[in-house]
Amino acid sequence: VFSHKTGGDRDEQLEAIPVERDDRNQAIGPMQKIQARTTFTFPGRNGKYSNLTWTGQHFDTVHQNTLPPGDARIYRTKPKTFATEVHHHYGTDDFQLACAIDTDHPAVQDDLKLWGEWINDTTGVDGFCFEGAAYLRPTFLNEWLVHVRRYSRRKLFAVGDYWAEDVESLHHFISTTGGQLAMLDVPLHYNFHRASRAGGRFDLRRILFGTLMREQPTLAVTFVENHNSQPLRALESVVEPWFKPLAYAMILLRREGYPCVFYGDYYGGHYVDIGRDRQPHEIWLNSHRFLIDKFLYARKHYAHGPQYDYFEHPDCLGWTRLGTPDFPKAMAVVLSDAAGGAQWMEVGKPNTIFRDVTEHIPGLVQTNEAGWGDFRCLGGSVSVWVEV
């Protein structure tokens, strides 16, 4: 976690100014002395990994002041300023919680780069996911990635978890970091969320509008659900179970993006947590493993080559993959969020037999002499037709 530290070893007195919680650029009191747990000595490590002792000078914001007991205001420490290149939610997102790390401080930069070298040498990691990327200064993140990639002599994959429904915020972050890391396609997730709750009234022709999958496909990490959006989480935006197979077909069987499968969607899950009504709720997550395995099989063997889209109908979409010399067999995908439907689509294989690997529709489809076929799906469902 590059944005903050918590659970320090000692209190420290600092000069700081309290700021408004909902607009952190606005001071709500004078500069004053506070006491916060900003000293991190890590006594158990005994300097083995780093000689840096973290103190108040290495943080720009804190979320505690123990001089008056119970003071949980946000304080900007003297003489720090908030970064200007981060997202401007709450005036600035240069603070998430606890003790916010000042990545402009040279000692902080050196220590985080040293950690990058250590984690590379110790684990052989082949990539990084930056949780809460909205709270990180893009310029330092870019510098850190360049350093660690040069050190490792590998093109380490990197993805930022930047929870913004507005795709323009993601474009801005990508631009600021020079395209050094991919981004979670949060706008696509919200399109799935809305479509799943629209009762068949969502215009599927617009399912990719305003998404990285459509606008920057080589930097889009696509997902259906994750730990942020699942039930009872702070950013709850559930994709309803009936729609998840349609959504997974879209991220796994198209050429755009780097798809992720959520553990809870694959294995299912069960937990109890507190809802917004402050009452406990029992949650069961359905396993979609049967169909996800079918999609993964189709992705491996058939989702190759040119892609033709058939997005003319508001309730029924389709696309085809025509194959490559190494993976010559074709595939046709058709899905509907309302009544069952069909798409007349080209697969480039004349007089060829196709079967539905999802097993939703029995029987076979044969293409005509021009390589076109009538591929069907059931209502609120998806079928994946592959060359026999």
Predicted regions and their residues:
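Intrinsically disordered, low-complexity transcriptional activation domains
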Residues: 58-62, 69
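Active-site-proximal helices and loops of the catalytic beta/alpha 8
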Residues: 2-5, 11-47, 51, 56, ...
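Active-site-adjacent "subsite" loops/lids of carbohydrate-active enzymes
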Residues: 53, 76-123, 133
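Surface-exposed loop and adjacent secondary-structure segments within mature catalytic domains
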Residues: 73
